[in-house]
Amino acid sequence: MKIDLTTLVTESRNKASENIDVLSTVEMLTVINQEDQKVALAVEAILPQIADVVDAIAVAFQSGGRLIYTGAGTSGRLGILDASECPPTYGSNPDLVVGLIAGGHKAILKAVENAEDNRELGASDLQDLGLNEKDVLVGIAASGRTPYVLGAMEYAKSVGATVATLSCNPNSPMTELADINMTPVVGPEVVTGSSRMKAGTAQKLVLNMLTTGAMIRTGKVFGNLMVDVEATNAKLVQRQKNIVIEATGCSEVEASEALSQCDNHCKTAILMVLSGLDAQSAKAKLAQHNGFIRNALSDQ
């Protein structure tokens, strides 16, 4: 079956790089860098749509739902990367944000032939996860037409989940299925069709915003401090202390004492120092206010 890619922005030729193979190395890299500068502007143009998805994810988290990313190739790997960073950064359950890739885990390191063309696989992977109406699905595909992602989106719609799309081609088949469309149009790639470049960069920027925004909206950031970070290595043990110090103005000794009294739960230590509560009372107060430090502090 012939696939017509001629109408896709991501498959068109970039006039700025038509002679890139005869440029000096610095000139070549200058072209790439100049093209990359267009990416942030393309993302800026869709901030309202990104905000809608962030708010939907926050509601899902607060209602017992999850964020599920689905994609093939680079798009799938970027979703997995973003999902994998949430537990160490925000202390979240690994099941809260999940990344799926066409072809499964082996496709993370090596392309699995034809996996992205399997529409039924996109649906069955979500069935295996038990996707339901509380969840948010973000379908990721630069082209906006990947069958694996389309199958996943169709299944998500059928169970009542919120469906968003992240693609770099306007008016794609994916946009017709989504409740919310995020379409940063970055233009033709420096190497024609190599959507791991500008399109991939745009996707990474948007995914950063989705999880960061949702975690902020659900109380996992105080000021600009990652107050739910877990002390899983030496660097993060020190980071926890530094966060308590920054949030409260206390000494390192006081920060260490507070953390030791509350099983190294950063939020609890901060509330203990700022409110004078003991560890048990501080934990209870945080639970009462769904983990929001500011709300717990105002209820004194």
UniProtKB/Swiss-Prot annotation:
Reaction it catalyzes: N-acetyl-D-muramate 6-phosphate + H2O = N-acetyl-D-glucosamine 6-phosphate + (R)-lactate
Entry keyword Lyase: yes
Signal sequence bounds: none
GO molecular function terms noted in the UniProt entry: carbohydrate derivative binding; carbon-oxygen lyase activity; ether hydrolase activity
Pfam family membership, one: GKRP_SIS_N
PROSITE patterns named among the record's database cross-references: GCKR, SIS
Keyword list, A-Z: Carbohydrate metabolism, Lyase
SIS domain sequence ranges: 57-220
GO BP of this protein: 1,6-anhydro-N-acetyl-beta-muramic acid catabolic process; amino sugar catabolic process; N-acetylmuramic acid catabolic process; peptidoglycan turnover
Catalytic class of the enzyme: lyase
Active site location: E85 (proton donor), E116
Domain of life assignment: Bacteria
Enzyme Commission number, as recorded: 4.2.1.126
Stored InterPro entries: Etherase_MurQ, Glucokinase_regulatory_CS, MURQ/GCKR, SIS_dom, SIS_dom_sf
Pathway: Amino-sugar metabolism; 1,6-anhydro-N-acetylmuramate degradation; Amino-sugar metabolism; N-acetylmuramate degradation; Cell wall biogenesis; peptidoglycan recycling
Entries under HAMAP family matching the protein: MurQ (MF_00068)
PANTHER family: GLUCOKINASE REGULATORY PROTEIN (PTHR10088:SF4)
Function of the molecule: Specifically catalyzes the cleavage of the D-lactyl ether substituent of MurNAc 6-phosphate, producing GlcNAc 6-phosphate and D-lactate. Together with AnmK, is also required for the utilization of anhydro-N-acetylmuramic acid (anhMurNAc) either imported from the medium or derived from its own cell wall murein, and thus plays a role in cell wall recycling.
Family affiliation: Belongs to the GCKR-like family. MurNAc-6-P etherase subfamily.
Note: A lyase-type mechanism (elimination/hydration) is suggested for the cleavage of the lactyl ether bond of MurNAc 6-phosphate, with the formation of an alpha,beta-unsaturated aldehyde intermediate with (E)-stereochemistry, followed by the syn addition of water to give product.
Subunit structure as annotated in this protein's UniProt entry: Homodimer.
Name of the protein this chain belongs to: N-acetylmuramic acid 6-phosphate etherase
Gene name in the database record: murQ
